[in-house]
């Protein structure tokens, strides 16, 4: 697996997207065996970056990613785990709670990258970013960012 270093962070060039792992918008436990097989196989062939979200299968994707990581031969430090907070959880306390819930489902002490999954309507991004920065200071998140933001909104969110 090829890697790239960006600002002192070394990342695999290809990651495993866990959308549909464990279901679609709600958990589908009938898929657990196939989902875990896919995740374990990915780990065995060298995948080290896993991307999930609290929205994927209503958090069940995070549970399965965490389970696959725990039973793998890989050390947590060798992996890069990304998860995302939904737009409905972007108030300060909601961001903190959403991250705690994600960490609980993953059964991990921290995530490498925590993203705002989608822009939200009427969201005060300053409040969301204050919470995200607190998570970084507290060691629960190593890096933060956004997903699915158009450039104009990204610039507005930085104001």
Identify the role of each PLM range.
Residues 89-159:
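Glycine/proline-rich, positively charged
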Residues 17, 51-53, 82-84, 114-117, ...:
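A cross-family glycoside hydrolase active-site/sugar-binding cleft signature
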Residues 1-79, 137:
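N-terminal binding-site loop/beta-alpha segment at the start of enzyme catalytic domains
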Residues 19-34, 83-93, 120-123:
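Active-site mouth loops of central-metabolism enzymes
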Residues 78-80, 142-143:
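Proline-centered loop/turn at the N-terminus of a beta-strand
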């Amino acid at each position: 697996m090829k890697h790239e270093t960006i600002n002192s962070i070394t990342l695999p060039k290809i990651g495993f997207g866990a959308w549909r792992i464990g279901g679609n918008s709600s958990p589908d436990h009938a898929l657990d065996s196939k989902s875990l097989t896919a995740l374990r196989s990915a780990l065995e062939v060298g995948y080290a970056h896993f991307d999930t979200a609290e929205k994927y299968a209503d958090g069940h994707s995070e549970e399965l990613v965490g389970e696959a990581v725990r039973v793998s031969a890989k050390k947590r430090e060798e992996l890069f785990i990304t998860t995302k907070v939904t737009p409905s959880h972007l108030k300060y306390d909601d961001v903190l709670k959403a991250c705690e819930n994600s960490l609980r489902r993953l059964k991990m002490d921290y995530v490498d990258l925590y993203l705002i999954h989608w822009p939200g309507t009427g969201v005060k991004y300053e409040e969301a970013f204050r919470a995200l920065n607190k998570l970084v200071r507290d060691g629960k998140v190593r890096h933060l960012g956004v997903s699915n933001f158009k450039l104009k909104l990204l610039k507005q969110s930085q104001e």
